[in-house]
Amino acid sequence: MKHIRRRNFTNGMIGAAASFGASSLLAQPAKKLTLYMGPPEPTSAALVAGFEKRSAAKLTMLRLSAGEAVNRIRAERNNPQASVLYGIGLPSMMTLKADGLLQPFKPAAAAEIPAKYKDPEGFWTGIDVDFIGFASNKTFLKEKGIKAPQSWEDLTRPEFAGQICLGSPATSGTGYTFITTVLQVMGEAKGWEYLKRLNPNVAQYTRSGIGPTQLVGRGEVGVGILFAHDILGSIHKGFPMEMSLPQEGTGFDLFCAVMLKGAPEPEMAKDFLEWAVTPESQELLAASEYFDVPTHPKAKVHDLVKPFQNAKLVNFDFNWAGNPATRQAIVTRFQN
């Protein structure tokens, strides 16, 4: 019988244990998180990269407009595919809350964020604030010999016939915010009458709210109705645009981060939401050319945004705008 010397046996056991340990580590599933995100692709990608670097997690991100996100999450009610919805406006978040599709979670790091930017029940936390503005192509204005629109009524002028572009309220949070702003500024009867008068001047209703930026930038249309961050981002990139705001006051939105009901990765979702409310995360927005006002008081405001921090804003009724019945009624009437 061959005898195995004790030393060799011990070394063999140590090697086997080390090998088993390494295999066990390799066998452990990697941390994963699936998100639906509203910001433009470069900004969403920068946020994903920032969190992956911090957490060593693997993130899967799908960029969706507000309407697309609401419709997709509703369709996935019985089999949720994503854990976090990020950067979609408050009316859409309130619609999802009313539908029972959000999971409350209060990030500890959100304690410093003002209460007006948070749901008291913890269903959503605001990340950044933005408002509706007008983006005008400078070449178009010069050739026409006109000034950029300064009021809602200016958009109905004949010189803007077929020259306006905005997102469809059926699929775009920007478009929905625009219409709900008009209805609140003018009242519903006068607001719908105004929208009917405006329609002949609209060349295109785009699927996404950011769609008009390229059309205005290339001079395919003269004016786009957009959130300010999209306009300022395009100006920053060198597009020949200028931004103006309606003197009557403009609508605004609070872009939020939420956990979805039945989130398949709840712990990673909580980690991401904790990070999303920090100054570090919010400053990535401007660093990736997404120019909004951050909700965290310690987050730096980009120089391009500072001149518009005191914009005249309407007293926007988010409870009304975010009500699913309101949304359905507005979208149905708009489409008909």
Predicted features by range, described:
Residues 135-140, 179-180, 253-265, 284-285:
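A bilobed periplasmic-binding-protein/Venus flytrap-type ligand-binding module shared by bacterial periplasmic
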Residues 260-318:
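Mature extracytoplasmic/periplasmic domains
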Residues 1-17:
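N-terminal secretory signal peptides and thylakoid transit peptides that target proteins
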